[in-house]
Design a protein with these regions (language model features):
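Disulfide-stabilized extracellular recognition modules
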Residues: 51-104
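Short, surface-exposed glycine/acidic/tryptophan-bearing loops
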Residues: 6-54, 73
Length: 104
């Protein structure tokens, strides 16, 4: 189920990945701290990131061709999702994609 809170948090993370393309945040903490900072209750969580794809179809194709990203997408234990794309004309990859999954 698309979740407004997770979508808002994925917006934060996609913007952060334009600064540091990593599952770590620019402050050095794990990506999951964005959930804790905003009091998201969950028992399991995952993150997919991508950069450079200029359409949703292109990024989904790449994620589905990556075993670890595909596993997150297909994992039926996750019941909430947030997805976003941040565009920065001055960043190396221009397009920065984010998926957040949780089991709430």
């Amino acid at each position: 189920t698309k979740d407004t809170t997770l979508t808002n948090l994925s917006n934060i993370r996609s913007k952060e990945t334009a600064t540091l393309f990593s599952h770590q945040r620019p402050d050095g903490t794990s990506w999951s701290t964005v959930l804790k900072q905003h009091n998201v209750s969950y028992t399991s969580a995952a993150e997919n990131i991508a950069a450079g794809q200029n359409t949703p179809e292109a990024v989904v194709k790449e994620w589905m061709n990556s075993p670890s990203h595909r596993a997150n997408i297909m994992n039926s234990k996750y019941n909430k999702i947030g997805v976003s794309c941040y565009v920065d004309q001055n960043a190396p990859y221009r397009y920065y994609w984010e998926q957040l999954f949780i089991k709430g």
